[in-house]
Amino acid sequence: MVRLAIVVAEFNYDITQLMLQKAVEHAKFLGAEITYIVKTPGVYDIPMILKELVAKEEVDAVATLGAVIQGATKHDELVATQAARKILDIAVESGKPITLGIIGHGANRIQALERVEEYARRAVEAAVKMARRKKALREAKYNGSTVYID
C-alpha cells in the first residue's frame, strides 16, 4: 500500500478545499493510505513543508494541491513557477515522487473551479503510480530479457 501525504495551500481556499476533498476520495479509490495532510498558507510555502515530509519514513509519495489565480500583475507567474521548480528539486533530491496538482498560473477563478477535480485526481494518481513503479523498479532483476515496469 502506498503511503501518501498531501500538501494543500490555503490561499484560494474555496478552490483548494474542494481539491483536497477530491484528492482524498481518489486516494481511497486507489487503495493508498493517507499518512499526512498538511496545509500551508500558500503555494509558495509548499516546498518548505515538503522537505520535512519526504524525510519521514511513513511517506512514500506526496501530492501537492493549490490554485494560483491570475491577477493584475505577474505575481501569479512568479509564485507558480518558483514553487514548481522547488517542488521538482525536492523530489529529485529526496528520491520520493512529488506531484504537481497546482492550478495556474494564468488561470482565472472560473477556470480554476473547472479544473478542481482533474488536477486533484491527476496529482494523486501520479503520486501513487510513481511510488508503486519506484518500488517495482527497486525490486526488479534483469535476467536477460527486458524488464517492463507499469
Curated annotation (Swiss-Prot):
Keywords: Riboflavin biosynthesis, Transferase. (2S)-2-hydroxy-3-oxobutyl phosphate binds at A72, T73, R115. CDD domains: Lumazine_synthase_archaeal (cd09211). GO terms for cellular component: cytoplasm; riboflavin synthase complex. The keyword Transferase applies. 5-amino-6-(D-ribitylamino)uracil binds at F11, V43, Y44, D45, A67, V68, I69, L100. SUPFAM superfamilies: Lumazine synthase. The keyword Transferase applies. Its EC number is 2.5.1.78. It catalyses: (2S)-2-hydroxy-3-oxobutyl phosphate + 5-amino-6-(D-ribitylamino)uracil = 6,7-dimethyl-8-(1-D-ribityl)lumazine + phosphate + 2 H2O + H(+). The active site is at H75 (proton donor). Pfam families: DMRL_synthase. One of its GO terms (molecular function) is 6,7-dimethyl-8-ribityllumazine synthase activity. Pathway: Cofactor biosynthesis; riboflavin biosynthesis; riboflavin from 2-hydroxy-3-oxobutyl phosphate and 5-amino-6-(D-ribitylamino)uracil: step 1/2. One of its GO terms (biological process) is riboflavin biosynthetic process. It comes from the Archaea. Catalyzes the formation of 6,7-dimethyl-8-ribityllumazine by condensation of 5-amino-6-(D-ribitylamino)uracil with 3,4-dihydroxy-2-butanone 4-phosphate. This is the penultimate step in the biosynthesis of riboflavin. Belongs to the DMRL synthase family. This is 6,7-dimethyl-8-ribityllumazine synthase. The gene is ribH.
